[in-house]
Amino acid sequence: MQIKLANPRGFCAGVDRAIEIVNRALEVFGPPIYVRHEVVHNKFVVEDLRSRGAIFVEELDQVPDDVIVIFSAHGVSQAVRTEAAGRGLKVFDATCPLVTKVHIEVARYSRDGRECILIGHAGHPEVEGTMGQYDAANGGAIYLVEDEEDVASLQVRNPEALAFVTQTTLSMDDTSRVIDALRKRFPAIGGPRKDDICYATQNRQDAVKQLADECDVVLVVGSPNSSNSNRLRELAERMATPAYLIDGAEDMQQGWFDGVERIGITAGASAPEVLVRGVIQQLQAWGATGADELAGREENITFSMPKELRVKSLL
């Protein structure tokens, strides 16, 4: 069996920044540091931060007064920000800047009284945060659609004053079909020049397609609650390549690889490379050879840290 590695894979700039914000806060201020929601959707990362003093909560009413709170990479609603400010909590915002870009678009449509359609998955924290940027006080409304069927049944107030945005971690192929359905049903609809799916999601989806084309089975390292990791698994399966979403080497079954010649490995944007290395080591123990990385798109994007953490870490 031969191992092939997707390129790029694993951590993106937004995840790197979010994890580093928690790390720096722990170093500068000491534990405990409260984090609203898992800072990124990866069990290994969350458990590591928890062991060092991060306390993960789902709502601010679980947070005592006079502590530091970090908002996760997925972003939060305006109501959460207002609650934190009203309680005087010290907040560091780890929202991915590409999610913030979508928030700004939604807030602008809200101010203009323009109805907005969000393409996304119900219940995902990014979707909840993005929906929560819309203030209907100016007469508009925001709607959530997941697929073409939702578009077909959607009732809006004014199809002439309508715009769309998208969750950043969706399947590009699925989203393209939903956007086409929106434009067909609502010809006057506005939106971003291209969808809001982030560069890292696009690059990892392109890479897994190449991997699935060249391999007999694909392993996606990522947690079950990671949206972008699930999309990678689905893309490989759509290309008729068996694919498995695993948290790490311990989730693998040797029988998956009976009769397999080429094993492809990729990782979601929240999965650290150490987990990929663990998978490679286990496969090699089962007789696999090599770990050749495919040609791919270079990523050199970085996002700046909050100023207070950046300055204090140098003292």
Swiss-Prot record:
Primary gene name: ispH
CDD domains: lytB_ispH
Keyword Manganese (UniProt): no
One GO term (biological process): terpenoid biosynthetic process
EC number: 1.17.7.4
Name of the molecule in the record: 4-hydroxy-3-methylbut-2-enyl diphosphate reductase
Annotated active site: 126
Family designation: Belongs to the IspH family.
